[in-house]
Structures are given as C-alpha cells and as structure tokens.
Regions:
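Metal-cofactor-dependent catalytic cores
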Residues: 1-146
Length: 146
C-alpha cells in the first residue's frame, strides 16, 4: 500500500490548529522540527487520511490543512485499518504506529472552531524510528507487521 503526503503541518502550541509547510526535518525519537507535539513520548507525529478529511468537508465543514491538529495529511492510506506496530516509510523517515485514535477529555480549540473533531476516531499517532527530510508530494509506504 502506498500513499502521498498532501500536507505537512506544525504548530507552536498544543490544542491549536497547525499551519502547513512545504517540507520539514523529522528528528529521530522526537518528531517534526518546531512542532509543539514533538518530544520523547509515543505521539511524536500524528497522521490523518486525506480522504477522511474530505468526507468531513463534504458534510459542510470548512476545514483546512492542519485544522484537526494533524502533522501529516496523507492520501491513499486508511491508517485506522492497520494495527499498532505498523511502520510507514517516507524516504529515509521511518515512523511506527503507536496509537489509533485518542480521547478528547475536554473540547479543545479545534472542537470549538469546527464543531467536532475527527482525530479521536480517524487520527493515528506514531513515534519516529529514523529521521530525515520530507516534502509535500513524497510517497508513503506501508510496512506491515509480519
């Protein structure tokens, strides 16, 4: 299975919309350079299916890249269909799936702006096994557990 990076998004603070960039350095065991969610934990990089975001937009929501706090918006891959431990390769970068969905304990700024959030159901989280440089348009390869 292969997908394409449609957007790369970062933010300075947690719980806010992220803004798109054309390319970025992903740091091993840390996350995206200059992103608030980067650090030594299991949710270093968040991914969201472009198709799921487009389905949400088709219901009338006015959302842009990064609106749900996703780091990578990727077309062609249904992330929630893969188990924890699945890896995603983008050039030299290797990410490992650590969490599917998340709890939304209190409605964050994203929820208040959009009315709901798809990250609790459709977002996935990864840790960085190997860092490198990625760009919008790069291919994403799924490496399934054996």
């Amino acid at each position: 299975m292969e997908g394409i990076i449609k957007a790369i998004c970062i933010s300075k603070q947690k719980g806010t919309e992220k803004h798109p960039v054309q390319d970025i350095e992903i740091i091993e065991d840390h996350g995206l350079e200059k992103d608030a969610h980067a650090g030594k934990w299991h949710r270093q990089v968040s991914l969201l299916s472009y198709e799921k975001r487009e389905e949400f937009k088709a219901k009338g929501a006015n959302v842009e890249d990064g609106a749900f706090g996703e780091n990578l918006l990727v077309s062609g891959i249904e992330f929630t269909s893969y188990p924890v431990g699945t890896q995603f390769k983008m050039g030299d970068v290797l990410l490992e799936l650590t969490q599917i969905g998340k709890s939304c304990h209190s409605h964050c700024a994203i929820y208040h702006q959009v009315g709901q959030c798809i990250m609790p159901r459709q977002g996935v989280f990864t840790r960085v096994i190997h860092g490198g440089h990625i760009c919008v348009g790069d291919k994403v390869e799924v490496i399934e557990n054996k």
